[in-house]
Every structure is written in structure tokens, then in C-alpha cells.
């Protein structure tokens, strides 16, 4: 599969200039449905209409406007927006370096891969190796599609990844949520049991293990319908009742985990006997 870059520019690192290309690191895998007319099954079309002129408008007739008062707009052109972009807008300007643990994941939005061009490989390797050695990530600013973005550069695999980030004012406060259990007293025994349950479920992260079960069910369902097969409904998940005794629930959960781990370990022991 041909991978195409979505942006070309450079990383500015002190007096070092690193020409790079930007590539999307993620892609959506959701099952997409088309909206069809129920009677004839043809796709629904959406038209851009002006309610005042009562007619459809073309893309050339559409402009951007900011509503500064109810029903009142100031028109902003694309040229004006581009004129507001700072000089060096094709540059990822590194401002500082921080430890990854200092940034909460809530700040990260989207991930991209950074690839050096032929003349920037040595400088790229230098930055990557320095970030790896210091266990740091770089905070930078860049203009993407006329919009200034706060980004973080870090080592990922053999290269560098760039995460777009939210600004602090874009993250909502938790204060309006009220009391989040801070006034509730938890006994030392309950705390110990909860920690024990967490420890028993702790394991190395294996990304392959985490697949979208719902997406697979939808795909199987669609394939069955396309092939004219009988549709089998999924069994209903038992409704979980209200937990009355927290300690009993924790004990039962720990026992359930132990039982499951024994079942998973049994086939491995059986295989060892056969190979010995």
C-alpha cells in the first residue's frame, strides 16, 4: 500500500533544521453505513441551501463568518486567515523538552509519524537518539491547515511520532461534577482487597489482545445478511444488580480471577507434558 505524506516541512531544533514529511499514524476502522431512502434504497443527498434566498448554493458562493452578535457576522476570507499565520509556518518549532510522565494523556488528540527526507536523516537520527537517551519529549508549535497547533514529539519505535495537543483552556474542569467520592471513607481492608484485585488483573500491555468486539459482531452480522444466512441474535447479558456488600463483591471478583487464571494455565501445563 502506498503511503502518502499529508504535510511537508521541517523540525527546528535550536540551529538544527530537519526536513521531514508528516504521515497519519492512525485510521478509523468503524463500519460505515449509508443513509438510504426507505422506498427505493438510493443514497440520500444533502444540499446546501440558503433559507433566505430559498435556493441551493454552490461552494463558490459560500464564505466563512464569525457570529459576534445574534444574527450578525463578520466575514473572514481564506487569504486573511493565511495572512495571520506566522512566518515559518512550514516549521515545527521546538520550544522546550519535558518528561513524558509530566503530561497527562487527556492533552493528546491525534498522532502522526515524522519521516526525514534524504538530506535530513542524520539530524533526524540525532534528535531521535537524544530524546531516547534523555527520556524526554519535545513541545513545539506548528501551523496545520492555517491553525496553530501545540504538539509533542517523542520517540516511537524506530522513529519519531508527533501528537497534536489540547490547550489548557480546551480541557473542562471537573469541579462542576461535584463530590466524586472524596467525602466517602474507605476502610483499610476494602482498600487492600481492591489493590489485590488490581494486582491479580495486572499484565503486560498487548495491543493485539484489544480488538473491537462490537465491530466484529457488526461485520459478521452484515456478512451473514449479504449471504442470506439466518441471523442469530446474541444472548442477552445478565443485568448486574446493585452491589450491597462491597467486601463480598471484591472477594468474589478476586476468586473469579483466580479461577479464570487456573483455566488458562491448565492447557499450557498439558502441552508441556506432551512435549516432554
From Swiss-Prot:
Keywords of this entry: DNA damage, DNA recombination, DNA repair, DNA-binding
InterPro entries recorded: Ku70/Ku80_beta-barrel_dom (IPR006164), Prok_Ku (IPR009187), SPOC-like_C_dom_sf (IPR016194)
Protein name: Non-homologous end joining protein Ku
HAMAP family: Prokaryotic_Ku (MF_01875)
Region (Disordered), start-end ranges: 256-276
Gene Ontology biological process: DNA recombination; double-strand break repair via nonhomologous end joining
GO molecular-function terms, A-Z: double-stranded DNA binding
A Pfam match: Ku
Signal peptide, first to last residue: none
Domain of life: Bacteria
Family listed: Belongs to the prokaryotic Ku family.
Subunit structure: Homodimer. Interacts with LigD.
Species this protein is from: Heliobacterium modesticaldum (strain ATCC 51547 / Ice1)
Protein role: With LigD forms a non-homologous end joining (NHEJ) DNA repair enzyme, which repairs dsDNA breaks with reduced fidelity. Binds linear dsDNA with 5'- and 3'- overhangs but not closed circular dsDNA nor ssDNA. Recruits and stimulates the ligase activity of LigD.
Residue ranges of every copy of the Ku domain listed in the record: 11-177
NCBIfam families referenced in this protein's UniProt entry, alphabetically: Ku_bact
